[in-house]
Amino acid sequence: MNANPKFLSATATVDEAAIQPLPNSTKIYIQGSRPDIRVPMRKITQSDTAASFGFEKNPAIYVYDTSGPYTDPEAKIDIRSGLDTPRLPWILERQDTEELPGPTSEYGIERLNDPKLAELRFNLHRKPRRALAGKNVSQMHYARQGIITPEMEFVAIRENMNRRAYLEELKQSGPKGEKLAELMGRQHPGQSFGAAIPQEITAEFVRSEIARGRAIIPANINHPEIEPMIIGRNFLVKINANIGNSAVTSSIGEEVEKMTWAIRWGGDNVMDLSTGKHIHETREWIIRNSPVPIGTVPIYQALEKVNGKAEDLTWEIFRDTLIEQAEQGVDYFTIHAGVLLRYVPMTAKRMTGIVSRGGSIMAKWCLAHHKESFLYEHFEDICEIMKAYDVSFSLGDGLRPGSIYDANDEAQLGELKTLGELTQIAWKHDVQVMIEGPGHVPMHLIKENMDLQLEQCHEAPFYTLGPLTTDIAPGYDHITSGIGAAQIGWYGTAMLCYVTPKEHLGLPNKVDVKDGIITYKIAAHAADLAKGHIGAQIRDNALSKARFEFRWDDQFNIGLDPDKAREFHDETLPKDSAKVAHFCSMCGPHFCSMKITQEVREYAAKQGITEIQALKKGMEVKAIEFVKSGSEIYQKQ
């Protein structure tokens, strides 16, 4: 990508790499109780098991898909028009919102009327919506009224990943179908640390979890383009990807490209953390083209409005920013309302002080005015805005540790307690909440973080940045944090915020975004396996079976990154014939453990004996050969 290329709305195009279907994959839609509930999944077709392994059909497997219409060949993608709006009929039929004449925030009106921005602006013809006076349009409010919304049914179907149909197809696949279904459906019992994961996710279970505050569906009424997803301890672990420009690099086009690239590889949510030029316009382009929820940190943009002087921030400026972003369709706001004046001195003893941008902004404001922040003082006013658009809180950990030296200190844990108190205030308004967490934490202190969060924040979903388990690896912090992410996901964190290799070093590009996503997909999936999430092991079992049967293309295609797997294999064995070979370049044809195992099984079958008997008999034969050869360990050639 070129540095800061000129972006023009009239010539904006989609990233061609992001709209190619993944190998041997088809986008399918599972219909719910009504025709307009169409839940996307990715169907990965497999080849048959070769006759040499006892021929059998291998039905397609189904995996969770976050790429929206971008990987659907039948969808017409034009980022200048944005995506279709599948949620709009659901929002309208509830009859609890009104269409506004246009933006109502001062800043939104100002940007709309600025002729210099015409060539950058996304030309949205739809007007923003807001709750009718006295109404609450949050998914939590509906859940507490006993209402199962289409969004709730959608995520229930999505979480089950068509598992029942897959196992049924296996049973019908041939004479060995029942045995095969049992084999592929088998998984190790997990340790869920008190989570309540059901055998099957139902719409009623989704409703009850949202009503209790243990899960959220981030879904602003002004973001009808999204395919609903759920964040909660009793659901699949999700991942968030951060994108956004800075004052020195990136353009609108590049950020839209990063978003489409992130969701291709499995980003469940995306946060736009832009701090550079045209924040408002960049966000509009991202939201209108995003099928996943979009989050922001509104204080970043508010700071730009006062030329970077934290002490000049006011409640009025911040309130206008919240309304501006809510009317654009932001699904969740990170708000650092837990940074209290009394906590700031506690950070003086730290190795790395306050490392959160939002936290440092609010700490500076508190010290400059010597009082609690307007975020804390106006928290109930913020709740009124959130429930008018169904924006979820992501209560920010402004005092998170920026080094393992500072992990689990009094500032971090004091703020956590305050976030729990704010959670209960938000719930009083039926506003959805998740809690942000650290940060940098050594492995032996990670579980304490999770246990304290569950206790003090009343089981609201936890959303953590890693945590990084060591500070010695700049350039590899996707790995140092992936270790902690897998652990804390197992203990109960609902969503993991990815870290890219560029963490602490620079703004990530597309390659870094993919590396971060894949690392965190691994961590999230490992956590699902460890928790014993029903059906989580099906993909592992399918890949392992393909590996044992030397179905190379199936191995590549079932994996998280088919392109990388195929590239690595082809570096040493590039010919098509190698895709059916019963060995790889690691061990070669004579030392492949799986090939040897297959030979043992074939020998046992021919002799009419068990595999254990075959191994014993083979050892006896080799012993006789050894004695006959002179009992020398090393034979002369």
Curated annotation (Swiss-Prot):
GO cellular component: cytosol
Domain of life: Bacteria
GO biological process: thiamine biosynthetic process; thiamine diphosphate biosynthetic process
Entry note: cofactor: Binds 1 [4Fe-4S] cluster per subunit. The cluster is coordinated with 3 cysteines and an exchangeable S-adenosyl-L-methionine.
Keywords on record: 4Fe-4S, Iron, Iron-sulfur, Lyase, Metal-binding, S-adenosyl-L-methionine, Thiamine biosynthesis, Zinc
Reaction(s) catalysed by this chain's protein: 5-amino-1-(5-phospho-beta-D-ribosyl)imidazole + S-adenosyl-L-methionine = 4-amino-2-methyl-5-(phosphooxymethyl)pyrimidine + CO + 5'-deoxyadenosine + formate + L-methionine + 3 H(+)
Annotated EC: 4.1.99.17
Disulfide links within the chain: none
PANTHER family documented for this protein: PHOSPHOMETHYLPYRIMIDINE SYNTHASE, CHLOROPLASTIC (PTHR30557:SF1), THIAMINE BIOSYNTHESIS PROTEIN THIC (PTHR30557)
Assembly: Homodimer.
The name this protein goes by in its record: Phosphomethylpyrimidine synthase
Species per Swiss-Prot/TrEMBL record: Herminiimonas arsenicoxydans
Gene: thiC
